[in-house]
Amino acid sequence: MLLSHKTSIKICPEYSNIIGHMCYAASKLWNVCNYERHHYKELGLEKYPDWYYQKKAHKGDLWYRQLPSQTAQETCKQLDKAWKSFYVLKKTGGIKEPNPPRFKQDNIPVTYMQMGIRHEKGSDQLRLSLPKDLKSYMEETYGIHEKFLYLENKIFRNMDHIKQLRIYPPENGTCELIVIYEIEEPEQLSQNGHYLSVDLGLHNLMTCYDSGNGRTFILGRKYLSLERYFHKEIARVQSVWYAQQSERGIKYPKSSKHIQRLYRKKQNAVKDYLHKTTRWIAEYCRKEDIRCVVVGDIRNIRKEKDMGHKTNQKFHGLPYNRLYIMLEYKLKLYGIQLIKQEESYTSQCSPLSPEVSNRYAEASNRKERGIYITDGVRYNADAVGSFNILRKYLSVSGKQKELYVTGLKTPEIIKVAA
């Protein structure tokens, strides 16, 4: 089982110079190979230059030799994946008039493969190899005599099998890393009839129903607040920055470092919050001995739907796929199974209806926002949705279990990282 961990480390000026040069060389290698793919007919090539051709043809090039061999090959491979994605989109029409991969204007991350990394078990230090041409260039140009790169961080201690290390261009003496490492895959637990169903939404990011005690609770109400705060702040800074450029006669305003920093901060804040909410669910399942989590499958729910520009911005920004990935691997660490269940009519059917289907769907029962009323009884609409998702899964899989509706009226609000 492969896991990734993102962290940042402080580096000395010599290391910053070396890593920065490798990131620069990677961007130049990308551009050379990309130009070759764009203009292979004008260059007189008989066949389209794929990854196998380019990693051999450019082996003696300047920028290729400034990188470790496998790192240079991985750069060519990432470009190859980008072009394959472009052709798939062009063929399937996933995006109208897709653009081919662009040329890189800035430095790009470099990826060290397993052969270029040396790590002793239990050590907090990594040793990275450097290519011969890069070492001689650094020695002649800057007087840097480093033979290897030694990176230290406490997270390396618990990583026995490091597969990849992705290094981002350094900024202000710090460098971001993504470490991909392998662990032994936990054995999946046998089912005990205890389920947790999850309904994804906007205002209530995750509404959960516990089949063991009928408890319902809501997680993730801070998500929209984070999105709203950063959108307003980015819009405020953009309006000031663009107005200043317009006064100077700039026809096409450019972004600023402040705006880019806000985008990064927003991305990190949302990602951190999603990690904390999914971790809370995984720990809850472990403590309550829940061995199966059923989550509503909302993929393609946004397709060909227009709900107004405000709701569209919220709905299309919902990172549901990232939630699925985070939930799946965190639950997998405890041997808990994750199942995605198609959720049509789960929000319209009464929790007391014989089955969840179009026949018993009553959209008019949702009288107010967040309230579902049937036979004079008021339920929380999202709690009804999570309850019906579990009912639908049990019906489809041919399983039977007695479920309680008493907890659907007033779900508990769980505050995570508030």
Feature map (PLM): residue ranges:
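Gly/serine-rich nucleotide phosphate-binding loop at the start of the catalytic core
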Residues: 1-74
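Stable alpha-helical structural segments in soluble proteins, enriched in small hydrophobic residues
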Residues: 33, 74-86, 383-393
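Long, hydrophobic, amphipathic alpha-helical segments used as structural scaffolds
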Residues: 34-37, 41, 83, 87-94, ...
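Acidic carboxylate diad motif detector
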Residues: 49-170, 317
